[in-house]
Every structure is written in C-alpha cells, then in structure tokens.
Amino acid sequence: MEKLNVAIADDNERMVDLLSTLVKGDKELELVGQAADGQEIYKIIKEKEPDVVLLDIIMPKMDGITVMEKVNEDPSVRKRPAFIIIS
C-alpha cells in the first residue's frame, strides 16, 4: 500500500511536534512538510503535493481559511489535498 503524504501547519511548536510524532509513528503515513505559518504551508503544498494537510486556522502571515482558498483557486496546484482543521 502506498503511503499517504502528510503536511502539518500550526504556529504552536508543541502541536507540530506532537502531530509530527504521531505521523512518523504510523507506517501508512509519510511526513512531507511542516510549517509555522500560512505562507510556508502554501509553498509546501505547491512543492510537495501532500495528500492530507493538518491545518491550523489562526496562524501568522496567512490564516488557514485563506490557505485553503488559495490552493483551490491556484491552477498550478495539480493535486488538491484533503484539509483537516486543527486548533
């Protein structure tokens, strides 16, 4: 079975560490990126094309809602990830 690629975005470092540990501990998941702000995760989504993004709503530089809107509007994003909202 092919692994699901996962990216994480949260400005809370402890939350990112916790979620990263959980993802890395699951043999069916592959962590492809971590970000502390919306601009950074948007760049990761475009470059790494994750299957799933664990996304905080309230983040600096760009909030999670704006990230989702930009991804859905950007024709250069070939693979649309599933977003899971975290807080």
Which residues fall in each region the model found?
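Two-component/phosphorelay signaling modules centered on CheY-like receiver
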Residues: 5, 13-33
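Active-site residues of response regulator receiver
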Residues: 10, 56
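Acidic catalytic/metal-coordinating carboxylates
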Residues: 37-40, 63-69
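Active-site beta3 strand of CheY-like receiver
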Residues: 48-54
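Receiver (REC) domain active-site loop signature in two-component systems and cognate sites
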Residues: 59
